[in-house]
From Swiss-Prot:
Any GO MF annotation of the entry: structural constituent of ribosome
The name this protein goes by in its record: Large ribosomal subunit protein eL21
PANTHER family cross-referenced by the UniProt entry: 60S RIBOSOMAL PROTEIN L21 (PTHR20981)
Primary gene name: rpl21e
A GO CC annotation given for this chain: ribosome
Pfam families in UniProt: Ribosomal_L21e
Species, as recorded: Methanosarcina mazei (strain ATCC BAA-159 / DSM 3647 / Goe1 / Go1 / JCM 11833 / OCM 88)
């Protein structure tokens, strides 16, 4: 059998919650708002599948450059190139200075 090439491949531990984090996420994560230019961390919540960024961006930090619907558009550097990542607020954390 050949290996799969799906979007969630190689994510056995990346998309796994610890025992204390299990269950649904709080509503406050869904209604948090970010401003343009704000730096945010991508922290994927596996209990929310809609609006999930590609798992290869787990742990990346990016700048909010806009909003499309309820999702935010982030500018993320991957190597020498800048990528645009779309994500709902459940998968984002504000950066603390």
């Amino acid at each position: 059998m050949t290996n799969s090439h799906g979007e969630r491949r190689c994510t056995r531990y990346k998309l796994q919650k610890t025992v204390r984090e299990r269950g649904i996420s709080p509503v406050s994560k869904a209604i948090q708002e970010f401003e343009d230019g704000q730096m945010v961390h991508i922290d994927i919540d596996p209990s929310v599948q809609k609006g999930m960024p590609n798992p290869k961006f787990q742990g990346f930090t990016g700048k909010v450059i806009g909003q499309r619907g309820r999702s935010y558009i982030l500018a993320v550097r991957e190597g020498n190139s800048m990528k645009e990542v779309f994500s709902v607020p459940q998968h984002l954390k504000p950066q603390k200075y």
